[in-house]
Amino acid sequence: MSGHRSTRKRCGDSHPESPVGFGHMSTTGCVLNKLFQLPTPPLSRHQLKRLEEHRYQSAGRSLLEPLMQGYWEWLVRRVPSWIAPNLITIIGLSINICTTILLVFYCPTATEQAPLWAYIACACGLFIYQSLDAIDGKQARRTNSSSPLGELFDHGCDSLSTVFVVLGTCIAVQLGTNPDWMFFCCFAGTFMFYCAHWQTYVSGTLRFGIIDVTEVQIFIIIMHLLAVIGGPPFWQSMIPVLNIQMKIFPALCTVAGTIFSCTNYFRVIFTGGVGKNGSTIAGTSVLSPFLHIGSVITLAAMIYKKSAVQLFEKHPCLYILTFGFVSAKITNKLVVAHMTKSEMHLHDTAFIGPALLFLDQYFNSFIDEYIVLWIALVFSFFDLIRYCVSVCNQIASHLHIHVFRIKVSTAHSNHH
């Protein structure tokens, strides 16, 4: 989504309103706002100026998109015009996260059997998220409220959803019995999502493949339903000829999908730079974004393999969420770098959580690794939320709009 939403008064004017659009801020609201806001604005004046000039560009369509368009068009017409697009997105994300956390609660090591209704809830939660995520842009155009903030918010929610979706899938097939495969599948998912925006940072255009997010989500929904129908015996059954367990089949599909997608992504990354001398949209090296995701995956792999207490094997869900929050933040920063045509800096507070785990192992687990993992999880989550809230509030204030509310006023022109 791009363009401009309806205007509003800035926070701090004669009738101060919260940037998130919930009206007058109470004392508690002010305290929370300070707690979840960075001490200094994350974006510079020049970045905000370039953000205003940003225009959303996409190319291609996936296999199922034409079939789903009719349903999405029908669904968006059922949504009241006063509901903000970002509110639609955050509702879908919240449902997706809550249903996945149910599975995490029942299956903390991804080897247990959850109640059947939990798998059904997870399948429904993912379908709801897919549906709402697909119509937020349509709602923005329908209400003439498109903005760069809407595009950023949409991608930000997707980055977090990716973490929970891949984790929920691994739990559904009980992949915790094969920790190496679970590690690969979870980090392959976040890596591919990062690469999708990496090539956008290079080329300026978000490209969709024949097999893309919609198709993968439908496949995952089917796997949740198979967990309901077949249960553990189904995933533990052997595939004839291949002589592997059924649960390994989705992992092999992930390998194939990673190779296929990354081939297309890196073709664009190495040849599609729109900046000077084939550089990124910001004029930086096309390889520079690799340092961030490469650091995350390298740290995750080293800590996994060097743990003396089998930290990942015993607590895979906590581990994936910890590094997933880190990946989500650096992906969000990549999206911001693309939309503001700016450089990505490697130094980031997102790496503090993984660094704590690494240093604890370096000093022979001076503190119980499980305790440090919880500290890293909480810090990484707080760091992600703090950054996202700060960016959204700053952009909303700059564009004179609300994050979660459409203000009735003279509509601005659409760019999406």
Swiss-Prot record:
<dbReference type="InterPro" id="IPR048254">
    <property type="entry name" value="CDP_ALCOHOL_P_TRANSF_CS"/>
</dbReference>
<keyword id="KW-0325">Glycoprotein</keyword>
<dbReference type="GO" id="GO:0046872">
    <property type="term" value="F:metal ion binding"/>
</dbReference>
<feature type="binding site">
    <location>
        <position position="154"/>
    </location>
    <ligand>
        <name>Mg(2+) 2</name>
    </ligand>
</feature>
<keyword id="KW-0460">Magnesium</keyword>
<feature type="transmembrane region" description="Helical">
    <location>
        <begin position="246"/>
        <end position="267"/>
    </location>
</feature>
<keyword id="KW-1208">Phospholipid metabolism</keyword>
<dbReference type="Pfam" id="PF01066">
    <property type="entry name" value="CDP-OH_P_transf"/>
</dbReference>
<feature type="region of interest" description="Disordered">
    <location>
        <begin position="1"/>
        <end position="20"/>
    </location>
</feature>
<keyword id="KW-0479">Metal-binding</keyword>
<feature type="transmembrane region" description="Helical">
    <location>
        <begin position="368"/>
        <end position="388"/>
    </location>
</feature>
<keyword id="KW-1133">Transmembrane helix</keyword>
<keyword id="KW-0594">Phospholipid biosynthesis</keyword>
<keyword id="KW-0808">Transferase</keyword>
<keyword id="KW-0464">Manganese</keyword>
<dbReference type="InterPro" id="IPR000462">
    <property type="entry name" value="CDP-OH_P_trans"/>
</dbReference>
<comment type="pathway">
    <text>Phospholipid metabolism; phosphatidylethanolamine biosynthesis; phosphatidylethanolamine from ethanolamine: step 3/3.</text>
</comment>
<dbReference type="GO" id="GO:0047359">
    <property type="term" value="F:1-alkenyl-2-acylglycerol choline phosphotransferase activity"/>
</dbReference>
<keyword id="KW-0597">Phosphoprotein</keyword>
<dbReference type="InterPro" id="IPR014472">
    <property type="entry name" value="CHOPT"/>
</dbReference>
<comment type="similarity">
    <text>Belongs to the CDP-alcohol phosphatidyltransferase class-I family.</text>
</comment>
<feature type="glycosylation site" description="N-linked (GlcNAc...) asparagine">
    <location>
        <position position="144"/>
    </location>
</feature>
<dbReference type="GO" id="GO:0005794">
    <property type="term" value="C:Golgi apparatus"/>
</dbReference>
<feature type="transmembrane region" description="Helical">
    <location>
        <begin position="210"/>
        <end position="230"/>
    </location>
</feature>
<comment type="pathway">
    <text>Phospholipid metabolism; phosphatidylcholine biosynthesis; phosphatidylcholine from phosphocholine: step 2/2.</text>
</comment>
<dbReference type="GO" id="GO:0004307">
    <property type="term" value="F:ethanolaminephosphotransferase activity"/>
</dbReference>
<feature type="modified residue" description="Phosphoserine">
    <location>
        <position position="18"/>
    </location>
</feature>
<feature type="transmembrane region" description="Helical">
    <location>
        <begin position="156"/>
        <end position="176"/>
    </location>
</feature>
<comment type="function">
    <text>Catalyzes both phosphatidylcholine and phosphatidylethanolamine biosynthesis from CDP-choline and CDP-ethanolamine, respectively. Involved in protein-dependent process of phospholipid transport to distribute phosphatidyl choline to the lumenal surface. Has a higher cholinephosphotransferase activity than ethanolaminephosphotransferase activity.</text>
</comment>
<feature type="binding site">
    <location>
        <position position="151"/>
    </location>
    <ligand>
        <name>CDP-choline</name>
    </ligand>
</feature>
<dbReference type="InterPro" id="IPR043130">
    <property type="entry name" value="CDP-OH_PTrfase_TM_dom"/>
</dbReference>
<feature type="site" description="Increases basicity of active site His">
    <location>
        <position position="151"/>
    </location>
</feature>
<feature type="binding site">
    <location>
        <position position="158"/>
    </location>
    <ligand>
        <name>Mg(2+) 2</name>
    </ligand>
</feature>
<feature type="binding site">
    <location>
        <position position="133"/>
    </location>
    <ligand>
        <name>Mg(2+) 2</name>
    </ligand>
</feature>
<dbReference type="GO" id="GO:0006629">
    <property type="term" value="P:lipid metabolic process"/>
</dbReference>
<feature type="binding site">
    <location>
        <position position="133"/>
    </location>
    <ligand>
        <name>Mg(2+) 1</name>
    </ligand>
</feature>
<dbReference type="GO" id="GO:0005789">
    <property type="term" value="C:endoplasmic reticulum membrane"/>
</dbReference>
<keyword id="KW-0472">Membrane</keyword>
<keyword id="KW-0444">Lipid biosynthesis</keyword>
<protein>
    <recommendedName>
        <fullName>Choline/ethanolaminephosphotransferase 1</fullName>
        <ecNumber>2.7.8.1</ecNumber>
        <ecNumber>2.7.8.2</ecNumber>
        <ecNumber>2.7.8.22</ecNumber>
    </recommendedName>
</protein>
<feature type="transmembrane region" description="Helical">
    <location>
        <begin position="349"/>
        <end position="363"/>
    </location>
</feature>
<keyword id="KW-0539">Nucleus</keyword>
